[in-house]
A protein has these predicted regions:
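A short, polar/charged loop-to-alpha-helix boundary motif
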Residues: 53-64
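Beta-lactamase-like hydrolase cores
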Residues: 2-38, 123-126, 139
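Conserved catalytic neighborhood of penicillin-recognizing serine enzymes
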Residues: 40, 85-146, 190, 202-212
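Active-site-proximal helix/loop microenvironment
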Residues: 152-207
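Extracytoplasmic
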Residues: 8-12, 29-32, 39, 53, ...
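Short, charged, amphipathic alpha-helices and their helix-cap/turn boundaries
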Residues: 141-157
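Active-site SXXK
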Residues: 41-42, 62-93, 125, 180-184
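A short, well-structured edge-of-sheet supersecondary motif
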Residues: 26-54, 149, 195-201
Length: 212
């Protein structure tokens, strides 16, 4: 249900060959970031904090605080499972309105499709990333339980106790979010991202190894 409009037919991207690899040869208008993490060992297999360290030393993996959006929803559903809910639990997918107080507009979250689906299982809710189900579920179990679950994944900052947090309106770093997903993939066992796995002396002798 997502449409990728980043590229279209006829677009030209300039690249150059370097050391048997191809790299982009034009400066992008925006910077991105990526981290590849082994969920079982914590080893960082790849990391790029931006297009050019020379042009910007700001590391967008470890320093940039960004809204995770729907990527935060698994934390909500894990909190629900921890409270006794199951994948088969039915949650109403219907309009939801929050009164934010005097002088403030009412908050009316919506699904990506702008449609409503009635009673739906939690499993479908996370699978289809349903906003209205997630907000209703968050209100039912309490945002304090969700923030507590986030803390279990070492996401401790940038979150407030309001319902919009359940849809990822807080801020996290990419490495924090990736670590949280790694913990899920690792069956709930916590890991720490390791940027260095071993160090060798100039003579080739190993003087440090994270596995020892």
């Amino acid at each position: 249900w997502l449409l990728d409009i980043s590229f279209k037919k006829g677009d030209v991207i300039y690249i150059q060959k370097k050391n048997n690899n191809y790299i982009i040869n034009q400066e992008p208008k925006v910077n991105g970031a990526i981290i590849v993490l082994d969920p079982y060992t914590g080893d960082v297999l790849a990391l790029s904090g931006g297009y050019s360290f020379k042009k910007s030393e700001f590391n967008r993996v470890t320093q940039a605080k960004r809204q995770p959006g729907s990527a935060f929803k698994p934390i909500v559903y894990l909190a629900a499972l921890n409270e006794g809910y199951s994948p088969a639990t039915l949650i109403l997918d219907a309009p939801y309105v929050v009164d934010q107080g005097p002088g403030l507009p009412k908050w009316k979250p919506s699904n990506y499709t702008d449609e409503f689906y009635g009673l739906t299982t939690m499993r479908t809710g996370i699978e289809k990333s349903r906003n209205l189900m997630t907000v209703r579920l968050a209100n039912r179990i309490g945002m304090n339980k969700i923030l507590s679950m986030a803390n279990n994944f070492d996401i401790n900052e940038g979150l407030d106790e309001n319902l919009s947090m359940s849809l990822g309106s807080g801020v996290v770093t990419l490495i924090e979010l990736t670590k949280a997903y790694a913990i899920i993939a690792n069956g709930g066992k916590k890991i720490e991202p390791k940027l260095i796995t071993s160090i060798y002396s100039k003579d080739g002798n190993k003087i440090y190894d994270t596995r020892l």
